[in-house]
């Protein structure tokens, strides 16, 4: 066979194998016996080995996995992968329905989908070809796991139509595959996976794609992040469109005309969840109309047009052996039950929350009791009851201490609170927990500074507050356990990079009581510098939208502390950014002009700008960039092949600019 014949045969084999794979893995209707599929795959592999220059990125052979990667790159999601609000009972669902109808009117229909217990991923296609696959990460930044996702047979390497589209889905491991994997691990003397979700996530985060390829993973596609050239009206239509493109879409998704239909759907699958060949932990309820999605919008964390109904958590019995006390970064002392290990909802549980002293007293919890453990929301185990009839008389009463278990300061209960607090600002536990919060993903996001490293730094007295992180030296870090030269260099680089973080990240990282990520962003925008915020009065803070009396009082009290002034001075001297770097109100009013207060949509291919660069320019000049066109859109910037967004803008009379007009406007604004 010459090269020309080989090229022709390879095309035939790829088409055949793609079609057979689609029918087997997506439609569950095999066209040929496994032996025939294997024969064709072996022929493909042999031809590609003979003619390596004819191997393509979308060949079915990539399902087998390529060479290991040195690490996973961080990638930004163009459209954030937000989490969903939760509903735990019928009343929560009815409250969600009321909020939706109040916002968009009485005529609302929903789509119910099973909530798969796996790993959320984003798949990006350009002209129908898979170019990137990423984990959800924190919703804004994920990890590039493209090579591993290529090994999942249910993920099309090339779509049935050449769309440029971002698709969201859930990668999961079927129950049967999970059981086979754990049997193999047990025989090999290796630690077994706790549940299919952990197995799926662990498989896709292997640096060697060949490992992921052997794990028999699958994927259900459930939404579209972005698409060019296609306009669908409802969420259910988008699911059907994904099916047309070749994705595996769950057959149990259903349109529900009323909230009563939604409740019936959740009850049905709550009872029948164990009949499925894969794990689910609830039902996702979405408003069907995409126009209503636009009207409802988003909170800081989640869309208002969707909610996740969580199934009632499993409850099991075990013995409470001891109660451990933990001091958090705000000084709250939390009791935690230490239990005989027990399997709850697929996870081995050894510890469970007891919340506070009042709950211990109310439930009459004693050491040695047989207790009921429940996984609230299938995430956090908690003790919900005691079986007093199982007592033997050997159980021991538990009393909360009067002193902090870490620094031995007297514990106090503040007015209106049930929690006991340590009010000593120099309490080692509070400082340690504050450091962990400061470096966390939503705060300063310093890679390589986990709890174990921070505990070592604290133990060796290398740090006493968050500012000391910026004074760490290479030789000091090399003395720590499991800190080699590469790890130390990476850590120091991450610490250095964090100096350029936004003011809102720093504010959130400081751990001011009642100031969450959203409030930190508001404060940074309103006051623009740390110095102005330090000087802000209670009245000035209260005048800011979303800042209530409790938060205003907490902020004023925080900045009045002498140790806080010292800390901020140390941070500033270390070079940590103390200034708001986003679009400033004064700049928007005086300079931005053209984008001030405007909602802008970018569509099509831009030749002079990347999409990210254009978005940053618009935001720096006072505008807001969104991903879809609606009546709230003020301006559409259309590049080449703009597609449906430009047509929609034209149909509703929204101003449209060419890339040249956009570039001129930016240049004039910057003169």
UniProtKB/Swiss-Prot annotation:
Q: Name one GO biological process term.
A: DNA repair
* Gene Ontology CC entries for this record: cytosol
Task: Using the UniProt record, name the top-level EC class of this enzyme in a single word.
Answer: ligase
Q: Name one GO molecular function term.
A: DNA ligase (NAD+) activity
Pfam families registered for this protein in UniProt: BRCT (PF00533), DNA_ligase_aden (PF01653), DNA_ligase_OB (PF03120), DNA_ligase_ZBD (PF03119), HHH_2 (PF12826)
SMART domains, per the entry: BRCT, HhH1, LIGANc
Provide the residue positions that the database annotates as binding NAD(+): 34-38, 83-84, 113, 136, 170, 286, 310
> Which EC number applies?
6.5.1.2
Name the keywords, alphabetized: DNA damage, DNA repair, DNA replication, Ligase, Magnesium, Manganese, Metal-binding, NAD, Zinc
Superkingdom of this protein's organism: Bacteria
HAMAP family reported for this sequence: DNA_ligase_A
Job of this protein: DNA ligase that catalyzes the formation of phosphodiester linkages between 5'-phosphoryl and 3'-hydroxyl groups in double-stranded DNA using NAD as a coenzyme and as the energy source for the reaction. It is essential for DNA replication and repair of damaged DNA.
List the protein's name. DNA ligase
């Amino acid at each position: 066979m010459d090269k020309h014949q080989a090229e022709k045969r390879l095309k035939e084999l790829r088409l055949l194998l793609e079609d057979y794979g689609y029918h087997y893995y997506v439609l569950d209707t095999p066209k040929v016996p496994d032996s025939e599929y294997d024969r064709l795959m072996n022929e493909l592999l042999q031809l590609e080995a003979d003619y390596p220059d004819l191997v393509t990125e979308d060949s079915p052979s990539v399902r087998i996995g390529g060479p290991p990667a040195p690490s996973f790159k961080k990638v930004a999601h163009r459209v954030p992968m937000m989490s969903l609000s939760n509903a735990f009972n019928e009343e929560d669902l009815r409250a969600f329905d009321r909020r939706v109808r109040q916002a968009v009117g009485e005529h609302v229909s929903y789509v119910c989908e099973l909530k798969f217990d796996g790993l959320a991923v984003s798949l990006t296609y350009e002209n129908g070809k898979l170019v990137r696959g990423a984990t959800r990460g924190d919703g804004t930044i994920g990890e590039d796991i493209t090579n591993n996702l290529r090994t999942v047979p249910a993920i099309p390497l090339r779509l049935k139509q050449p769309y440029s589209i971002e698709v969201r889905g859930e990668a999961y491991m079927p129950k049967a595959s999970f059981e086979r994997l754990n049997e193999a691990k047990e025989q090999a003397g290796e630690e077994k996976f706790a549940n299919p979700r952990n197995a799926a996530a662990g498989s896709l985060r292997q640096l060697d794609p060949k490992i992921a390829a052997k794990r028999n993973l699958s994927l259900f596609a459930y939404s579209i992040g972005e698409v060019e050239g296609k306009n669908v009206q409802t969420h259910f239509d988008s699911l059907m469109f994904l099916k047309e493109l070749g994705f595996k879409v769950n057959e149990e998704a259903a349109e529900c005309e009323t909230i009563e239909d939604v409740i019936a759907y959740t009850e049905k699958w709550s009872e029948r969840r164990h009949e499925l060949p894969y794990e689910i932990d609830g039902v996702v309820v979405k408003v069907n109309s995409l126009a209503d999605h636009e009207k409802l919008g988003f909170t800081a964390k989640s869309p208002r047009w969707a909610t996740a109904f969580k199934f009632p958590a499993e409850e099991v019995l075990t013995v409470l052996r001891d109660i451990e006390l933990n001091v958090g970064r705000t000084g709250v002392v939390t009791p935690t039950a230490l239990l005989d290990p027990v399997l709850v909802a697929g996870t081995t549980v050894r510890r469970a929350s007891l919340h506070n002293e009042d709950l211990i007293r109310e439930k009459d919890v004693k050491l040695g009791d047989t207790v009921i453990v429940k996984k609230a929301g299938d995430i956090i185990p908690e003790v919900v009851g005691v079986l007093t009839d199982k007592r033997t008389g050997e159980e021991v009463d538990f009393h909360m201490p009067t002193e902090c278990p870490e620094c031995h300061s007297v514990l106090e209960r503040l007015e209106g609170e049930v929690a006991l607090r340590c009010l000593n600002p120099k309490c080692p536990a509070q400082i340690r927990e504050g450091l962990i919060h400061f470096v966390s993903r939503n705060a300063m996001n310093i890679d390589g500074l986990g709890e174990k490293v921070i505990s070592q730094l604290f133990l060796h007295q290398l740090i006493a507050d968050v500012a000391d992180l910026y004074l760490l030296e290479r030789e000091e870090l090399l003395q720590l356990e499991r800190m080699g030269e590469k790890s130390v260099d990476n850590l120091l680089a991450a610490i250095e990079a964090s100096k350029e973080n936004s003011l809102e990240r720093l504010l959130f990282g400081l751990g001011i009581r009642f100031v969450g990520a959203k409030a930190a962003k508001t404060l940074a925008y309103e006051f623009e510098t740390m110095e102005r915020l330090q000087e802000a009065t209670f009245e000035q803070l209260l005048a800011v939208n979303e800042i209530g009396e409790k938060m205003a009082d907490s902020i004023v009290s925080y900045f009045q502390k002498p140790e806080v002034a010292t800390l901020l001075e140390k941070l500033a001297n270390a070079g940590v950014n103390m200034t708001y770097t986003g679009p400033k109100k004064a700049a928007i009013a005086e300079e931005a002009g053209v984008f001030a207060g405007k909602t802008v949509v970018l569509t099509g291919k831009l030749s002079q700008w990347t999409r990210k660069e254009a978005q940053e320019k618009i935001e720096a000049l006072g505008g807001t960039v969104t991903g879809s066109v609606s009546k709230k859109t003020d301006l559409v910037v259309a590049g080449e092949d703009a597609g449906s967004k430009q047509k929609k803008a034209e149909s509703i009379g929204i101003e449209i600019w060419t890339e040249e007009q956009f570039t001129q406007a930016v240049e004039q604004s910057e003169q």
